[in-house]
Structure formats: structure tokens, C-alpha cells
Amino acid sequence: MCCLPVFVILLLLIASAPSVDAQPKTKDDVPLAPLHDNAKSALQHLNQRCCQTFYWCCVQGK
């Protein structure tokens, strides 16, 4: 059950990855770098908390 948030965050990261059909930027576009940083830090926090209790749940990453 602890792994569910980790998988949800991974799915969100995959869904927000740039694609070949990317639209050109407009002045209303928001840069995605802060969103990626927040998701990365949330994933690291969940991974650390999860790995302390369930070693099989650990996600390997940099």
C-alpha cells in the first residue's frame, strides 16, 4: 500500500514528459521545471519513508 503513491507520482512524471507532438510555447505557458523539482523531491521523500519499513518497495533512482 505504501508503494501506491510512488507509482502515482511516476505515472504523473511519465505523463508530463515531453513528446514529439509538443506545441510551440506561448506567453501563457508555465515552465515545468518547478513541477518536476517538486515531484522529484516528493518521490525521494516517499522512497525514503517507504524503504525504512518495506525494503521490497524501494524505487531505485538517482
Curated annotation (Swiss-Prot):
GO-annotated cellular components: extracellular region
Tissue-wise expression: Expressed by the venom duct.
Record's keyword annotation contains Signal: yes
Signal peptide: 1-22
Modification type Glutamine amide: residues: 60
InterPro entries to which the protein is assigned, alphabetical: T-conotoxin (IPR031565)
Propeptide residue interval(s): 23-49
Domain of life from the UniProt record: Eukaryota
A GO MF label: toxin activity
One Pfam family of this chain: Chi-conotoxin
Post-translational modification: Contains 2 disulfide bonds that can be either 'C1-C3, C2-C4' or 'C1-C4, C2-C3', since these disulfide connectivities have been observed for conotoxins with cysteine framework V (for examples, see AC P0DQQ7 and AC P81755).
Keywords: Amidation, Disulfide bond, Secreted, Signal, Toxin
Localization: Secreted
Keyword Signal set for record: yes
Annotated domain remarks: The cysteine framework is V (CC-CC).
Family: Belongs to the conotoxin T superfamily.
Protein's UniProt name: Conotoxin Tx5.1
Source species: Conus textile (Cloth-of-gold cone)
